[in-house]
Curated annotation (Swiss-Prot):
This is Large ribosomal subunit protein mL37. It comes from Gallus gallus. The gene is MRPL37. InterPro entries: mtLSU_mL37, Ribosomal_mL37/mL65. GO terms for biological process: translation. Pfam families: PDCD9.
Length: 429
């Protein structure tokens, strides 16, 4: 008997591990109009779902526990004792009051901007929240200080090179220092270079750096209550304020400026909405503090991981918001809480850096009438993305046993430090 060739057949879908959909696809349209879908479930059914009671209470059974024996017994239920009242308030173990019972709770919500808020639209969103007109570049007065050789250090370029090398190469014994290490060191070295100008200008000694201070500023913008509060950057205070940067003609010209909107995105999309708050305006310093005028606000983005650092656009928005907050808090101390156009505008500067890339900002508060989009607006000058150096070679580059790129600082740009120094000297020279 001749053998027939074996015919290979493909196995069915269910035996190959492929899940097939039985029957026709489910309809994706709206739900059918029934009493449950139009008016909701009946009250008795809804109460049965919402009120989650133990099974023993639902069937009305007595619970037998091991409370009388005072030790665990298998098969008996765990006893439930009433909350123990210790007779005094323990702050670590006492439950706080409910939000509804807090004395500071209000029906109207407030949108909070704190140091961890990242603006989705960046500077445009901060402009709308602060009613501010943007001017690209630094003011002419600051640029004139930066370009004048009389306001520079002796051997300034070499001093800046040593400061960068100290932060990136010499400060640590690690092969490549972390950003959280070299960024604060570089900031301290640059501030030290700026302080050396106090020999030539003694009024620079009447300044003070403040860390870990808290600010609070409240304002209303188109029926929305906003507030800036909490910790922010390192603030340099002075005994005298910075004179206004823009002239009266430039301030009056801001009436014709139209603020940019980004509909359908809400300007408060990134802010934290709370109902327990206090409408507070506080500069963070007590009355009688001699260094009472904010001068420059410094932000250090020194996180090692890139997702934990603010992007340059978000950092500029953060600088604008907190420069505005410091200026608004100071304005309400000087002129009161009534919305008005300020007789003497308040100027606050800000510098942000991640240890290599610098952002410069000058903000001038012209008005505290921020409800509507009409009228005089505030002004801000921003000079963005200024590299102090291109790269720092911590480990020499070797090819075929030949050092092709030794360790050192490459691509130093002294113009960036000139702007840093000009903002430090602004208001004194």
């Amino acid at each position: 008997m001749a053998l027939r060739p074996v015919v290979l057949r493909r196995a069915p879908a269910h035996s190959r591990g492929i899940l097939t959909r039985p029957g026709p696809p489910r309809p994706r349209g709206p739900l059918p109009r029934t009493p449950w879908t139009t008016r909701g479930p009946p009250p008795d059914q809804l109460a049965r779902v919402v009120e989650r009671r133990p099974v023993r209470e639902q069937v009305e059974l007595d619970t037998v526990t091991y409370a009388g024996r005072q030790y665990f017994v298998p098969g008996l239920a765990r006893p439930r004792f009433p909350p123990w009242d210790r007779g005094w308030r323990e702050p670590w173990h006492s439950p706080g009051p409910r939000y509804e019972d807090m004395p500071l709770r209000k029906e109207r919500g407030c949108f909070i901007c704190h140091q961890r808020v990242r603006m989705l639209e960046g500077v445009r969103q901060a402009q709308w929240l602060t009613k501010t007109k943007l001017v690209q570049g630094l003011p002419a007065k600051v640029l004139s200080i930066a370009e004048n050789p009389a306001y520079q250090l002796q051997e300034q370029e070499e001093a800046v090179h040593r400061a960068v090398a100290h932060a990136r190469l010499w400060e640590t014994t690690e092969v490549s220092p972390r950003r959280e290490k070299y960024c604060p060191v570089l900031f301290e070295d640059l501030i030290h270079l700026c302080r050396s100008m106090s020999v030539k200008y003694p009024s620079l000694a009447r300044r003070m750096l403040a860390r870990n201070y808290r600010i609070a500023a409240t304002w209303e913008r188109e029926s929305t209550l906003l507030q800036i509060r909490g910790l922010n950057g390192i603030l340099m205070n002075s005994m005298t304020p910075i004179p206004p940067v823009a002239s009266k003609e430039e301030i009056l010209a801001t009436k014709d400026h139209v603020l940019e909107t980004f509909y359908p995105i809400s300007p408060t999309i990134d802010l934290q909405e709370v109902n327990v708050y206090q409408e507070l305006n506080d500069t963070g310093f007590k009355d009688g503090y001699p260094y009472s005028h904010p001068h420059t606000l410094y932000f250090l983005e020194s996180a090692n991981k890139r997702p934990n650092r603010f992007r340059p656009e978000q950092l500029r928005a953060k600088m604008l918001m907190f420069a505005f907050g410091n200026a608004l808090a100071k304005a309400k101390v000087l002129y009161g809480n009534d919305p008005q156009v300020l007789e003497q505008p308040i100027v606050v500067q800000s510098v942000g850096t991640d240890g290599q890339l610098f952002q410069f900002l000058v903000f001038q508060l012209n008005t505290t009438d921020l409800v509507s989009n009409d009228g005089i607006k505030n002004l801000v000058w921003i000079d963005s993305d200024q590299n102090l150096y291109e790269s720092a070679q911590c480990v020499p580059e070797v090819k075929k046993r030949v050092v092709t790129k030794p360790t050192g600082i490459y691509g130093l740009q002294p113009e960036t430090f000139k702007k840093f120094l000009a903002l430090y000297l602004h208001g004194t020279v």
